[in-house]
Amino acid sequence: MASGSNVEEYELDVEALVVILRDRNIGRNPLHGEIIGLRLTEGWWGQLERFQMVRLILQDEDNEPLQRPRHEIIPRAVNPHTMFVLSGPLAELQLAFQDLDLPEGPLRFGPLANGHYVEGDPYSRSYRPVTMAETAQMTRDELEDTLNTQSEIEIQMINLLELYEVETRALRRQLAERSSIGQGGISPGASHSRPPVSSFSGLPSLPAIPGIHTRAPSPPRATSTPGNIPRSLGDDNMPSSSFAGPSQPRVSFHPGNPFAEAEGHRPRSQSRERRRDIPSAPVISAPVPSAPPMIQYIPVPPPPPVGAVIPIQHIRSVTGEPPRNPREIPIWLGRNAPAIDGVFPTTTPDLRCRIINALLGGNLGLSLTPGDCITWDSAVATLFIRTYGQYPLHQLGNVLKGIADQEGVATAYTLGMMLSGQNYQLVSGIIRGYLPGQAVVTAMQQRLDQEIDDQTRAETFIQHLNAVYEILGLNARGQSIRASVTPQPRPSRGRGRGQSAPEPSQGPVNSGRGRQCPAPGQNDRGSNIQNQGQENSSQGGYNLRSRTYQPQRYGGGRGRRWNENTNNSETRPTEQSPQTPRPIQAGSGVRGNQSQTYKPAAGRGGRGNQNRNQRSSGAGDSRAVNTVTQSATSSTDESSSTTTAAPSGGQGN
């Protein structure tokens, strides 16, 4: 037998097939790819009718004739009304179709494989249930499917028989009424009870009621009143018939019958009482009239319930479209399984199978059966094996490592539990090596040791992992949150003696030590920039209190004790030469200039004005001055300046 995927192929004898066709007056040759239905009239199962479907393979893919033609089994039900069918015993058809045998399950019933019995159809009339020989050759699942189909067919046959029985009883009742009318004893319009069962002979009898005995029909007796007593006079005795009655009725109108209704009692006739007083007359019991046949309607079993409507569009809006790469589908499904259960709970494997097949409708070869979808774990494991192939269990670590690098440890743990059949000891030992850092390993081990057993640890592993990630400042994949934040440039702050950072310039820098004075209205802008710089500086590193006032020895000066109105009203030079000392304005004292001029330290030759310009211009938020650089600069200035620089240096003290 040559097998291609799941199709069973066997050898074909074309010459024997041509002989079979000629024996049945079919004047043509078999065709390549032709599908033929085989009607097996008898075989090892007995003289019962069974069906099989085959397809002829006479050419290869290049349309060249095969040296050894083949036929393949098609697992579909044969429909003799729409396809070509060959009939014959199994031994004769096996001459052409080698290794021919019965199909699996209910397909052997042919047109009845779907369980629908068609009244009047010749193939439905030839239905016969499976025999013991067939049952012995079936597997458990195959036998269940066959018996389910067989029970559906036989239930329909029972319903038809019951309908036939009802029609038969109605015909009996009509026949009894016509026979009684033909004897002249009862008028069609008169009220009367049912005729005795003895009036129609030859039909099947009804069951007798216990306690009511039958009697032989009595001959007509002579009466004092000429003619027959009509039924309307109250005589319970029916005119006897020449036909023999087979049985007793179920219900009668006799007053002594316990089955009679209370309001249906008929009064005794006086003529009957007079006859009972005559001693010479033999006592003959009256026949019990028949009751109408009781029609019992057995309700037809309800149709199978329609499956639940799956909101596939709503589910797809939550999960998104499946990946185009089939190898990414198992991971995608395992990650979205909780979301699917949240949108539409899957309570049965059949429902879970329908949802998965609907989501993966465009991926051929990934369709699942309810047996593959008992749980989400089994469904994901089946898809993983179909896309990646069968893998040994000792390679599960390599599989989970790739998943952990791509999707994170949580996803790797979930899929590992699915692929290993909920083997917590194996998966936890593998996942432990993929945790990001010893701190996570220690914290996880401490939390898991507090659980009762492995089942509880397996259920709470993801919760503990997310909690540890949150404590350590990691994201869902175990990566640092700080690394994901884009660093923002910020102005530097003074960090003490001998340390300074480059400050971003916010305007053209003029030559020399002096800087351009800010225009009126820029003081507020400079203070805002300074506050923003302090806020930005507190984002990184340690969160320390900003230094609002620096001591004089660090270049902070004496604080904001000058009069801002006076400073705004005074005119200051916009640019100073590093070689020329700042002249003293007329009409202002030395102490007044010192208080109005921001001088950080003594002997620094006009640096106070420069520091004030730096703070008001908003070029930087730092009040620190590099003392080492300033000392070197001051010494150079003192050696090259004129004698007017000495008083200004002394005034700084």
Curated annotation (Swiss-Prot):
Residue ranges with Basic and acidic residues bias: 262-278
GO cellular component, one term: host cell nucleus
Site annotation Cleavage: residues: R316, S317, F344, P345, N357, A358, N626, T627
Transmembrane segments: none
Gene Ontology biological process terms in this record: microtubule-dependent intracellular transport of viral material towards nucleus; symbiont entry into host cell; viral budding via host ESCRT complex; viral release from host cell
Region (Nucleic acid-binding): 490-515
UniProt miscellaneous comment: Foamy viruses are distinct from other retroviruses in many respects. Their protease is active as an uncleaved Pro-Pol protein. Mature particles do not include the usual processed retroviral structural protein (MA, CA and NC), but instead contain two large Gag proteins. Their functional nucleic acid appears to be either RNA or dsDNA (up to 20% of extracellular particles), because they probably proceed either to an early (before integration) or late reverse transcription (after assembly). Foamy viruses have the ability to retrotranspose intracellularly with high efficiency.
Function: Involved in capsid formation and genome binding. Shortly after infection, interaction between incoming particle-associated Gag proteins and host dynein allows centrosomal targeting of the viral genome (associated to Gag), prior to nucleus translocation and integration into host genome.
Protein's UniProt name: Gag polyprotein
